[in-house]
A protein has these predicted regions:
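Fe-S-dependent hydro-lyases/dehydratases of central metabolism
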Residues: 1-416
Length: 416
């Protein structure tokens, strides 16, 4: 019986010839990423709960401060200092203020065929480069950090066969929100979501990252794509060569298969308070907003900023809307400066912030108050996610978010 991409990566990491869904294997973890959201807890466990604390391979560790940058309180500063001091003591690769963790990982570390643990749920983004990325909690992270290994229950795989091309003004963000709405927030619980088909050739790396990144919002254990020339070009442009590129075998077993015509996708919003609560953006048009956010690990790349800046050129942000623009990394920020995008945003009245998680994380920049409404390219719209528990978050593409910031109400680009 053939194997899926997920099964092949696990088999490689486990040092066995074959695995199948439902098996449990001990695996060698190729890389371990953690951010300032929870790393302080890992450090406390390392220092206080281990008889013989040590790190199996410090070269596998990447620590990134991105959730509260710069620190917003003495408590946050102390937590980040703990992280910084530990990294200095042990020689851990450390990034602060350089961008959102998943963007940095994609730019600098992720390679096809790797099995990567991240102390963040959106680690599944790494599947855009054919890596098995999955989020773990502090205990599992610490075990892998100390032993270099962990256990994995081999997931079933849902396959999405993409055909056609997205219409003009429709984006990968609209596609993945459509899929999540179709299968539901629990539709891929502990399963791998695999994307293949001729339609993949029309999707850029930025598109692919956006798709894989949000798969956890359908409950997915991971998301995976085959490594093609587009992925290889991205990898090599960032100074890396592939280690192992996998495709599913013709006789691999899938728990479900969906055929999706990209040409049928329309602009989408996810309404409060669930990511699968989706509707065509036009149905939510006219909903007044107080804030708009263009950024995050899902939609803060240069391609997203280009979309937003193109719509803002010659226009102004609505006077009663706070429009936050947050590049996903310093590399993205610098490119946006070179292309004049930052100037366009500032002339239009947007607030351009340093690269970080910003309001998507909802604990520092741009949090919204009681009764306020945010439209966001962030990852989640749960109650209280972006501030007050009694606020409202709509999720949408960079184009819809920018158009809404201009109009002062939810709108699509063709409504400008």
């Amino acid at each position: 019986m053939g194997m899926t991409i997920a099964e092949k990566i696990i088999a490689r990491a486990a040092g066995v010839d074959t695995v199948k869904a439902g098996d449990i294997h001990t695996v060698e973890v190729d890389r371990l990423m953690s951010n300032d959201g929870t790393t302080h807890l890992t450090i406390d466990m390392y220092n206080n709960q281990l008889k013989h604390p040590h790190i199996a391979d410090v070269n596998k560790l990447v620590w990134i401060v991105d959730h509260n940058v710069p620190s917003d309180s003495p408590k946050t500063a102390a937590s980040q200092k703990k992280m910084r001091d530990f990294a200095r003591e042990h020689g851990i690769a450390f990034y602060e203020g350089q961008g959102v963790c998943h963007q940095i990982m994609m730019e600098k570390y992720v390679c096809p065929g790797e099995l990567i643990f991240g102390a963040d749920s959106h680690t599944c983004a790494y599947g855009a480069l054919g890596a098995f990325g999955t989020g773990v909690g502090c205990t599992d992270y610490l075990y892998a950090m100390v032993t270099g290994k962990s256990w994995v229950l081999v997931p079933e795989t849902i396959r999405f066969n993409l055909t056609g091309r997205l219409p003009e003004g429709v984006y990968a963000r609209d596609l993945i929100l459509t899929i999540i709405g179709k299968i539901g927030a629990n539709g891929a619980n502990y399963k791998a979501m695999e994307f293949v088909g001729e339609g993949m050739k029309t999707l850029s790396m930025s598109d692919r990252i956006s798709i894989c990144n949000l798969c956890v919002e359908a409950g997915a254990k991971t998301a995976l794509m085959e490594v093609d020339d587009i992925a290889l070009d991205y990898l090599r442009a960032h100074g890396r060569e592939p280690k192992a590129c996998f495709s599913s075998d013709p006789d691999a077993v899938f728990s479900a298969v969906y055929d999706i015509d990209l040409g049928s996708i329309v602009p989408i919003v996810a309404k409060p308070h669930f990511v699968d609560n989706v509707c065509p953006a036009g149905e939510a048009a006219g909903t007044r907003i107080d804030e708009a956010f263009l950024g995050s690990c899902n939609n803060g790349r240069i391609e997203d900023l280009r979309v937003g800046a193109a719509l803002l050129k010659g226009r102004k942000v609505h006077p009663l809307v706070c429009f936050l623009v947050v590049p996903a990394s310093q590399a993205v920020y610098q490119e946006a400066i070179k292309e004049g995008l930052i100037q366009t945003f500032m002339e239009a009245g947007a607030i351009v912030m340093n690269p970080n998680c910003s309001v998507c994380w909802g604990s520092c920049q741009g949090v919204i108050g009681e009764g306020e409404t945010l439209i966001s390219t962030g990852t989640r719209n749960f109650k209280g996610r972006a501030g007050h528990r009694d606020s409202f978050v709509y999720l949408a593409s960079a184009a819809t978010v920018t158009a809404s910031a201009i109009k002062g109400e939810i709108a699509t680009a063709d409504m400008l």
